[in-house]
């Protein structure tokens, strides 16, 4: 039996930041991950905002930056393009395309430098509550090992089992789980390899197709779809796009990534006695964009700080962990509620309506672009949006 103050399950961005902050604040921390190599295989499009990293004190490192981005291109079903470039418009959400395999590993290294112990190839197999905490049974390098912790932080992704084992209702409803698949491809003929491209409409029911540039002709080309919106698989939709899009029809895959993206909003049941849930496991994903790295990092920071303080207090009850809910609601959740409403509205639109909106957007003059200003412009150009979204601002 291994004893620790805090056990973090999952060494993705949220788990590593939680482990780092908890260790920096004086707690004894163990961070476990089931994979042989932290960060591999990658499971997302790898985009992250510069402002988000800066707010968390994470300095950019060329070793984990694949591409510095300048802007975004939104493409409607009839191929109307809305260009938004950082050279002419302020885009706080502009950022980087990461090498996630390297980024995740560096975040874990920072946790180790802060004092956290790391156990790789360690799979959590069960959990039970005891009077003085939680015991998580694991298989570590083929050997069964129990870890006794006063507090467990569940950072085990959208298929999270830890929160459920601990008695929390933290599973994402099927209708809000996007099915995602992505190729890293070579030979992509991008119109601008410093801008990300997002394709909307029936090409990706319930989601969108993305092209995220990683080099001159290298890009992540992927799709997210809601399975209750289509009879086809995400793979079938993506292959149809790749074969017909001029930018990708001659490209070849060098890697494939698959996974689920919870876009139903932040779960309410994200704390309990002796436990906190962070990152994708807690639904910290922007339902409008599907992006979750920045909010995952932020949720991890708050969880680590709150958990470490609870250790100092000697009180690991749900009541003493509720500051985590307050912090995430204040700094992340208030925006996500608006994004959820906007997502629901966009899902109600036909391709022709998206084309009309894109044509109006293409003529608009933006001073700054972020989800908030885009929603405001949507309300301005679409009477239907005014009815559905007018009360958001």
Swiss-Prot record:
Function as written in the Swiss-Prot or TrEMBL entry: Is involved in the reduction of 2,3-digeranylgeranylglycerophospholipids (unsaturated archaeols) into 2,3-diphytanylglycerophospholipids (saturated archaeols) in the biosynthesis of archaeal membrane lipids. Catalyzes the formation of archaetidic acid (2,3-di-O-phytanyl-sn-glyceryl phosphate) from 2,3-di-O-geranylgeranylglyceryl phosphate (DGGGP) via the hydrogenation of each double bond of the isoprenoid chains.
**Cofactor binding comment, as recorded:** Binds 1 FAD per subunit.
Protein name in UniProt: Digeranylgeranylglycerophospholipid reductase 2
Q: Which UniProt keywords apply?
A: FAD, Flavoprotein, Lipid biosynthesis, Lipid metabolism, Oxidoreductase, Phospholipid biosynthesis, Phospholipid metabolism
Query: Does the record carry Plastid as a key word?
Result: no
> What cofactors does the UniProt entry give for this protein?
FAD
Q: What are the recorded GO MF terms, alphabetically?
A: flavin adenine dinucleotide binding; geranylgeranyl reductase activity; oxidoreductase activity, acting on the CH-CH group of donors, NAD or NADP as acceptor
Q: What is its EC number?
A: 1.3.-.-
Task: Give the misc comment.
Answer: Reduction reaction proceeds via syn addition of hydrogen for double bonds.
Going by the record, the broad EC class of this enzyme is oxidoreductase
Q: What pathway or pathways are given for this protein in its record?
A: Membrane lipid metabolism; glycerophospholipid metabolism
Specify which residues bind FAD according to the UniProt entry for this protein.
33, 44-45, 47, 100, 124, 280, 292-293
Give a yes or no for keyword Mitochondrion in this entry: no
Spell out the NCBIfam families in the cross-references: GG-red-SF (TIGR02032)
List cellular component terms (GO).
membrane
Q: Which domain of life is it from?
A: Archaea
User: Which lineage is the organism of this entry classified under, starting from the top rank?
Assistant: Archaea, Methanobacteriati, Methanobacteriota, Methanomada group, Methanobacteria
Q: Name one GO biological process term.
A: membrane lipid biosynthetic process
Q: Which InterPro entries match?
A: DGGGPL_reductase, FAD/NAD-bd_sf, Geranylgeranyl_Rdtase_fam, Geranylgeranyl_reductase, GGR_cat
Family from the record: Belongs to the geranylgeranyl reductase family. DGGGPL reductase subfamily.
Reactions catalysed according to its record: a 2,3-bis-O-phytanyl-sn-glycerol 1-phospholipid + 8 A = a 2,3-bis-O-(geranylgeranyl)-sn-glycerol 1-phospholipid + 8 AH2; 2,3-bis-O-(phytanyl)-sn-glycerol 1-phosphate + 8 A = 2,3-bis-O-(geranylgeranyl)-sn-glycerol 1-phosphate + 8 AH2; CDP-2,3-bis-O-(geranylgeranyl)-sn-glycerol + 8 AH2 = CDP-2,3-bis-O-(phytanyl)-sn-glycerol + 8 A; archaetidylserine + 8 AH2 = 2,3-bis-O-phytanyl-sn-glycero-3-phospho-L-serine + 8 A
